[in-house]
């Protein structure tokens, strides 16, 4: 038995983890896997590379596989409520409120929401000129209202013109008009709901006693279909549409609703695409899990992990699909229609496929947001809310929708707000805590001062800059802000090369602020030395196939340097990385920790160097007012006057980082000599630091006398107990 199997993970999944050399679960996996397998919503935060992907992929794969197996064996959905193939005359799993649950047989509704009303309609309605009846029994205390409504009516029964309800407080309601009617009812009472379409009357009974006509239907609703409906607030009701004997038979020509023939009944259009179908299986394009990633690289990374994990899962086969831009839509559509159970995708392509009806959300059981803070910062809050609203909160086999959120910063206001709004009593798994720099990372700052270092004035092959100062009067001898800003850009290219040479960097990730900066540095390094400075770029303006190939080349160590932006590199797990260079500090202090955390993993030593300008640097900042959003933009005015530039103040950003980490970051000069404060004075970046122990052996020796004394006391106490037992 593998360590993962002790959490209840399938042996087939355990074999896959074993083959990946995952001997023991990481902390986040040990916490999250049992919680997800147990059916709960989970919020988890841990560093990139800590196994977050496995923490949600393994349990989701297991539950999806078990559901498919039960479908094949016919174990699930007895009572006709699996996979959207609902038997006529049950309460709908789809046409209902967010916090209302429907049992697998479709005949009992429950809502435990104290503050809001949540409603539900039946899967089938009646029409024509007949007289129809159903019973609703109050099975738990709470507030409830039951009756009839059209398909266009508000789920909050009785609050619009097309809903007619009778509530437990003894009030009838239509169009928000609440009038005294009959008498109050409560737990164990049986309410009969009568609809006379011939005379266009709605009436109710309580425990067999007719309470009289409650409503007369307006003529404009004469041709409408009416569905049994209920709305609950912390209450529960059981329904009988006539499949079994009524407790109080209606008489007077009324028949059970389920006895309405085809000419007098109509299926609820919101019951789902497979409603009434003979097959219990969901549609091939109705996945059970949706995993949203902020970038195509992360989506590919997660998809590849799922493919590895499910290698030994068979009979039935779990099919996963990657939905990202840059791939032909027809190709993805063809794969989707072959049957898909887990979808991993980026927001843009997911939205396109869902809005066009190619991906159905009717059977979605898991909604996963990976790197949620990045998704929210990219402006996908509205999309996430909309998708969550579309996904049924109770699946067709009676299981509750599970939401899993992974974020580097769980305590960010936006993430907290989203969790409160969308998640159901989530468990917080925060193994990250406050931002801190790992002991295995040396991080230093190299100040770039164009007033002290004037070598920028005589560079033979300077780096190409972003063009911010193309129309400014910048030249040596002119000490204007613009000239010093341009000098910073030139010096940073030189300092980057010098850092590479000084530390013989053969593998590093280099962060630039913008896509244009990445392109400029890539050209500069290639001009300086071919193979010696071999590099590739990773950012949103590169074609998807190129981005994929560039990342693979860097992972396979075919090139030495990966130049990228924060967004493109978010969440990428690149192992054994010894060096990282910040050409420009990030404007978000938490991103500094994310960047330098890419080195020094798996107990291997890493060096992070940040180039920080001592003077303000003028940089591009394309806001919503920029029509091209940066493409061929030449508006170098400041944003205060609707321009596309700002003055970037790195000393202030450095102060924010130091305050955030509560440390003073060590500074080095342009020679890039990094002081080593290790025990033996030697560090090889990228190799394990053998002296990072915690003194555990000494600690054991200190505890030996105490443990020995404890053993003696335990022996004495048990001996005393046995002696007294004999007496």
Curated annotation (Swiss-Prot):
- Which residue ranges does the UniProt annotation give for the motif DEAD box? 370-373
Q: What is this protein's record name? A: ATP-dependent RNA helicase Ddx1
Q: Which reaction does it catalyse?
A: ATP + H2O = ADP + phosphate + H(+)
Can you tell me where the transmembrane regions are? none
Instruction: Pinpoint the B30.2/SPRY domain residues.
Output: 69-246
Tell me the Gene3D superfamilies matching this sequence.
2.60.120.920, P-loop containing nucleotide triphosphate hydrolases
- What is the primary gene name for this protein? Ddx1
Q: Where is the Helicase C-terminal domain?
A: 483-676
Q: What cellular component GO annotations does this protein have?
A: nucleus; tRNA-splicing ligase complex
The family classification in the record reads: Belongs to the DEAD box helicase family. DDX1 subfamily.
Native source species: Drosophila melanogaster
